[in-house]
Design a protein with these regions (language model features):
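Pocket-flanking alpha-helical
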Residues: 50-54, 75-80, 97-98, 118-123, ...
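Conserved SAM-binding strand-loop segment of SAM-dependent methyltransferases
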Residues: 90-95
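N-terminal secretory signal peptides and thylakoid transit peptides that target proteins
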Residues: 1-17
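Hydrophobic or amphipathic alpha-helical targeting/insertion segments
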Residues: 159, 175-176, 185
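N-terminal Rossmann-like NAD(P) cofactor-binding module of classical short-chain dehydrogenase/reductase
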Residues: 108-109
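N-terminal Rossmann-like dinucleotide-binding module
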Residues: 13-85, 164-167, 256
Length: 432
């Protein structure tokens, strides 16, 4: 198979509308000084934060120096596990603002619930920290744009946790799409078929000992505590999460847009609902969304199903791209296959991963945001397209959107849902 140069990869993986964002080659750790040790704080350590800790601790000259979590039980257990595994002490903090005051911290890695992502990242930029932030980078479109502005204003490195962008195979797949391997690519499909069980309705209950419930809620409106919210099922409540299209689906929305070389759409139509469980989830179990790009002659289809369901060409979670000479199947984060012509003859294929954490650290060390594989601009777009679909679903109608102004056309009701009511002092400001 042809070997790709850095110039090849850069041309293939940078959308024309975002041409400043380069896809780098991997930089060896020997390129940096032996004393150039990076100190990272991980904020939110109960879910994805565990992977963040593992990922950063596996890198040369990188130290996870601080763990931060609003649940003291989780925090102490996490610190104990860290010290046992790595044979070193780690600082602990309940309040992320204390972390940002620590001038010895070079970068923060944010793995909180969705409603905290953008504000935590904006505060970090304002404090002079570089940021790795889990997907989605924002809970609504407004705060995604504010995060882009903050990263620019404070000249910070901000990486989004969409690790498939660092996959060698996926970078190669995008290059094939750009070069016309499957012809004119007119449609991308994202599939999110994951088991999401009945969560019941546990009602309200006393706040567990050790949990700072006020700080957990942060920007969200105050509610009584429920075990249905903490620690994972907050995903299914609009105040904190964005449903599965804004959870797992961000990987797939991001890849749809990357592969089609498009930004935000002009029309959005979503339909779905709750059909399986009589539980207290607010977000849909099933969601089918169509995003149209009439000027480019392209369309994105996103499909969320909770199981049981068929696979699509072997894919449960992934993407399919359709062209006039064939189609491409991307299964997960590190694998692609192509099928060419009317007889669907097998074409180029590859399975190969990458290291998204290392890519972030390389960019931080080099002080060069162009090295990022998952830059803040694409983070905003991948999250915002999911938010647009959710708004269409919640309003029950097709919406018309102006991608340049990032607002709906003549629709006050829909535009009001591009942001949220914030709870002081946890406010994403208009001027960052």
């Amino acid at each position: 198979m042809k070997k790709f140069t850095r110039r090849d990869i850069l041309k293939a993986t940078v959308p024309s509308s975002l041409a400043m964002m380069a896809i780098p080659t991997i930089i060896p750790s020997t390129a940096f000084g032996a004393n150039d040790r990076m100190r990272v704080a991980v904020i939110g350590i109960n879910g994805r934060g565990k992977d963040h800790i593992k990922g950063f601790m596996s890198l040369d000259n990188v130290e996870v120096a601080t763990l931060c979590d609003v649940d003291n039980v989780v925090l102490k257990a996490g610190a104990k596990a860290f010290e046992e595994k790595y044979n070193k002490k780690v600082n602990i903090e309940e309040d992320l603002r204390k972390v940002y005051e620590d001038k010895s911290i070079d970068a923060v890695s944010i793995a909180t619930p969705n409603h905290w992502h953008a504000l935590a990242a904006i505060w970090a930029c304002q404090a002079g920290k570089d940021v790795y932030v889990e997907k989605p980078a924002c809970h609504n479109l407004f705060e995604g744009r504010k995060l882009v502005e903050a990263a620019t204003k404070y000249n910070r490195i901000v990486q989004n946790g969409v690790q498939l962008r660092s996959s060698v195979a996926i970078q190669e797949a995008i290059k094939h799409l750009r070069e016309g391997l499957i012809g004119k690519v007119y449609m991308a499909r994202g599939t999110v078929y994951k088991w999401r069980p009945d969560i019941g309705d546990l009602g309200k209950s006393p706040i567990p000992e050790g949990l700072n419930w006020d700080l957990w809620q942060g920007p969200a409106q105050a509610r009584e505590f429920s075990k249905n919210y903490v620690h994972y099922n907050w995903h299914w409540f609009w105040e904190y999460g964005n449903g599965d299209v804004g959870n797992q689906g961000i990987h797939e929305t991001d890849l749809c847009m990357w592969g089609l070389d498009v930004g935000l759409p002009e029309t959005i139509t979503a339909a779905g609902g709750k059909y399986l469980w009589n539980d207290c989830k607010e977000t849909p179990e099933v969601l089918s969304t169509t995003y149209n790009y009439p000027k480019q002659g392209k369309v994105i289809q996103m499909e969320v199903r909770p199981w049981m369901t068929n696979k699509e060409d072997g894919v449960e979670v992934g993407n399919i791209f359709y062209g006039d000479k064939g189609y491409m199947v991307i299964n997960g984060y590190n694998d692609y296959k192509t099928y060419l012509g009317k007889n669907r003859e097998p074409g180029p294929a590859r399975n190969a991963g990458g290291d998204h954490y290392k890519n972030f650290i390389d960019a931080v060390r080099a002080k060069d945001k162009s090295l990022l594989n998952g830059p803040v601009e694409t983070a905003h777009l991948a999250a915002s397209i999911a938010h647009l679909g959710n708004i269409s679903y919640r309003l029950g109608r097709t919406l018309h959107f102006d991608p340049t102004k990032e607002s709906f056309v003549g629709d006050k009701e829909a535009n009001a849902m591009l942001t949220r009511k914030y709870r002081a002092p946890f406010v994403v400001p208009d001027k960052v």
